[in-house]
Amino acid sequence: MKKTATPKLRLLLSNDDGVYAKGLAILAKTLADLGEVDVVAPDRNRSGASNSLTLNAPLHIKNLENGMISVEGTPTDCVHLAITGVLPEMPDMVVAGINAGPNLGDDVWYSGTVAAAMEGRFLGLPALAVSLGGELFRYYETAAKVVYQLIQRIEKDSLPPSTILNINVPDLPYEELKGFEVTRLGTRHRAEPTIRQIDPRGHPIYWVGAAGPEQDSGPGTDFFAMNHHCVSITPLRVDLTHYEAFDQLASWVKRLEM
């Protein structure tokens, strides 16, 4: 009996560092062995764009010589356009990254990388966001290899429904990683103060302050795993409902007067 060839995956890649980012190029090259790779990414750095979607202006795209597609928009725009109109075929999975810098704890609320994965999940696809820790960004290949392994695992076992994986990888050679840890989000202290300066014309300008230092970073958190040279895998969900608050809210809502 003739064996039927296993169909190859079709992967959609995006990021928030921009279409020319090193991490994106290395990820695309590594994942090409798994199937067809489509890259649709912002035309420039869009870090911190979160889930913003452009609704009040047209979006221009450009087909680059290397086969990637550049979008004059946010990471969410990129994934939305790719899935709903730009790509000729529906992808099987969305992978966002490799981000230059970690997305830990409260970072996920602002991250364009996580938002790109989340948009894929909104549109019904399995989705991963991957970020490289540290500040020097030397070992993108390590993060790419981790993603390669995870995708192979997901192919066999699938993801739980409505789950996004937020993956953070230490900036180390692969051989120096201490393992994989399933983690929860930690938290940071409040952000550093806004920085006020004066421009050359004498007008005040402002810079958003740096992210706050680690606060909740004990065992079980994404911070802890990364600090101990482990890959952090945090399952995220789209449902933001605070179910534990229902009873308390219900008790005082009854006392409201119409």
From Swiss-Prot:
Cofactor note: Binds 1 divalent metal cation per subunit.
Main location as per UniProt: cytoplasm
Claim: Cytoplasm is one of the keywords in the record: yes
Keywords from the named record: Cytoplasm, Hydrolase, Metal-binding, Nucleotide-binding
GO cellular component: cytoplasm
Pfam families according to UniProt: SurE
KW Repeat (keyword) present: no
Binding sites annotated in the UniProt record for a divalent metal cation: 16-17, 47, 99
Molecular functions (GO terms): 3'-nucleotidase activity; 5'-nucleotidase activity; exopolyphosphatase activity; metal ion binding; nucleotide binding
Enzyme class: hydrolase
Reactions that this protein is recorded to catalyse: a ribonucleoside 5'-phosphate + H2O = a ribonucleoside + phosphate
UniProt superkingdom: Bacteria
Cofactor(s) annotated in UniProt: a divalent metal cation
EC number: 3.1.3.5
InterPro entries attached to this UniProt entry: SurE, SurE-like_Pase/nucleotidase, SurE-like_sf
Localization per record: Cytoplasm
Known role: Nucleotidase that shows phosphatase activity on nucleoside 5'-monophosphates.
Entry's family note: Belongs to the SurE nucleotidase family.
HAMAP family on file: SurE
Protein name per Swiss-Prot or TrEMBL: 5'-nucleotidase SurE
Organism, scientific name: Coxiella burnetii (strain Dugway 5J108-111)
